[in-house]
Every structure is written in C-alpha cells, then in structure tokens.
C-alpha cells in the first residue's frame, strides 16, 4: 500500500544482511527501479567479539548485493548512534527505567542519518525490510503508517516516531507480504541468506548476556529484594539490571517457605513488580496475575504523533504497551500537545506496564504515534 511510484526511481535500500531487506531489494529491482544498497554499521566496539555479528552481517549483505547485481556501500553511523541512541539508553537505565533503543534507532539513525546520507547520494526514496506499510490519505493530505499485513511480524510499534517527511521518503516492500512468502521468494531466487535466522535482541548487545554488557557502562549497588508484605526475600545486584515483569534471573526461585503472597500460590514463579530507587529496593511478587503487575492507567511523556493527534474522548482507539502485545482498547484521558504528555486508561488491566517502554496508539490498522511510559498505577 505504498504510494504509487513513477516507473523508475533511484532507491537506496538499507541492506542489513537479513532476508527481509534482501527480498525488499529484489522486489524493487523487479519493479524496474535503480537500486543501490547501504550497509549501516551502528556499533563499533568488539568487532572481534564472539557476540558481535556485524562483520558477518556485512559479508551476507555483500553476497546478496553481488547476487542481485547492485552496488553496496558500507557506512559507519557508530558516532551518531552513540550520541543519539546509546547515551539516552544509559540515561534511562540509570534513572531506573527500561528503554527501547530500537524505537530511537529507527527515528534517529535508520530514518534520519541513513535517510540524509541516501539523499546526498541522489536517492528518490529509501527502503528497508520492516514489516509495515505507508499510505497517502488524499482526504487529509497526510502519509499514514499502517501495520504490516503479517500480524506476527508487524513492526509499526518500533516505527511510531517517524514523521511525515520520513514516511514520504520511505518504502517498506515486504510490508504487504507474510514472512512465509518472503522466505519462499528468497529460496526461489537463490539468495545466499535465504535460511538465515531473524536477528533478536538489542542490536548493539547481540547475543551476549545483557547483565554482562550493562555492567561495563553503569555503576550499581546491591540492595534488598522484598515481597509484597515488605519481607526481605533476597538481594539484588543493582536495580538497573531488572525490569518489571521479569521472571528469570531474579535469584529468589524456590522460596516456597515464605508463604503465598496475594495473587499467587506458593508454587508460582516470582516476578519483578516494583523498583524503589530512593531505598534501592526491588520488589518481587508471586504469580503472573498478582495485582501489583496489573495497571489500568498510565502517564507518558515525549509523545510523537505521525499525523492526526488522538483527542480525549475519541473512540475507537487501541494501544500496545509492549511489542508483540495484542491491541487493547484504551482512552486518552488528557493530552498536552505543547508539553508532549498524555494520560491514558484501559478498560482491561494491562500486565507489567514498564516506565521507559513505549505506549503506541492505533486507530484500526493505522499507527497514530506514541509516547514513553513515565508511570503506571498498580492495583493494591
């Protein structure tokens, strides 16, 4: 559903080494466009580390470019990434929040630094392998960001900070396809990375243990872990290493002798429920459905709207408070466009609403934008 293009345009594709961007480049070539590829290097440290895949990703991207008969350029955006994305990532973790760097990376690197570089190369548009769609609405004159047609792969959540100029210059060729079809095409045309696994995790961390990585950049102070009755049940290694809803790695499994706090039986797993920075205390509760893990109201800041701004009292809205979550009906209770803040409520309780993560709003299949969760109520 991308805007209809003239017969031939110069399109610069962000070729990551993965199958989605590779098939995107092939589809554009099939449509008769002049396609040029750029491989973005966004993280410079540890190139020789067992956890870093950047070198192999570039080799895969170069192999794809060779098969497709297109030029590829290796561009280093590591300095921009550290200044615009990683520095904010560390600030948020230091403040006890859990940021989503992929959202900021898209807005600041892939659709700003990369877009600017592509335009200097004479590009008419850029393209990436994201599962999303762009549509021009003639009634409003606005470009709209739509969910990808594959509900299991939709990445509009991570793209909600894009603006009108960025959307007008961007194509998402695989957004109209299910992932299974993308894999089929890759195998059929003989792409060398057709069977490559999808990347997971935060791009600059790779496959390394998260705690090990974060420990290199943030100071930390151990402190008590308490349950919902205020009883000490363990010790944490530093609040920055934990996020709300976390189950693994808390270090208090098997404490059945502590009894059964509200919402969970004595054999149920423990979850991180609260972080108190003032007292350096981590709170954990037993049971997925514990009241402390349920919220129906939240406040958010740093709001970014793609086009139409949702209004208090507007019906038909839904939201996600984390990626891969099903849309949940919501209401905007208050919104300050100048301050870029909003407060929201949900008819149904939301699980482990986490400060620092994004709340993204939708009207049907249209992504309206979103904001960074500042705080959420927790049922007593």
UniProtKB/Swiss-Prot annotation:
Keywords: ATP-binding, Cytoplasm, Disulfide bond, Nucleotide-binding, RNA-binding, Transferase, tRNA processing, tRNA-binding. It is found in: Cytoplasm. It comes from the Bacteria. It catalyses: S-sulfanyl-L-cysteinyl-[protein] + uridine(34) in tRNA + AH2 + ATP = 2-thiouridine(34) in tRNA + L-cysteinyl-[protein] + A + AMP + diphosphate + H(+). Residues 153-155, 322-323 are annotated as: Interaction with tRNA. The keyword Iron does not apply. One of its GO terms (biological process) is tRNA wobble position uridine thiolation. SUPFAM superfamilies: Adenine nucleotide alpha hydrolases-like. Its EC number is 2.8.1.13. The record marks 130, 357 as: Interaction with tRNA. The keyword NAD does not apply. ATP binds at residues 14-21, 40, 129. Pfam families: tRNA_Me_trans, tRNA_Me_trans_C, tRNA_Me_trans_M. Signal peptide: none annotated. Disulfide bonds join 105-203. GO terms for molecular function: ATP binding; tRNA binding; tRNA-uridine 2-sulfurtransferase activity. The active site is at residues 105, 203. Residues 100-102 are annotated as: Interaction with target base in tRNA. GO terms for cellular component: cytoplasm. Catalyzes the 2-thiolation of uridine at the wobble position (U34) of tRNA, leading to the formation of s(2)U34. Belongs to the MnmA/TRMU family. HAMAP family: tRNA_thiouridyl_MnmA. PANTHER family: MITOCHONDRIAL TRNA-SPECIFIC 2-THIOURIDYLASE 1 (PTHR11933:SF5), TRNA 5-METHYLAMINOMETHYL-2-THIOURIDYLATE -METHYLTRANSFERASE (PTHR11933). This is tRNA-specific 2-thiouridylase MnmA. It comes from Leptothrix cholodnii (strain ATCC 51168 / LMG 8142 / SP-6) (Leptothrix discophora (strain SP-6)).
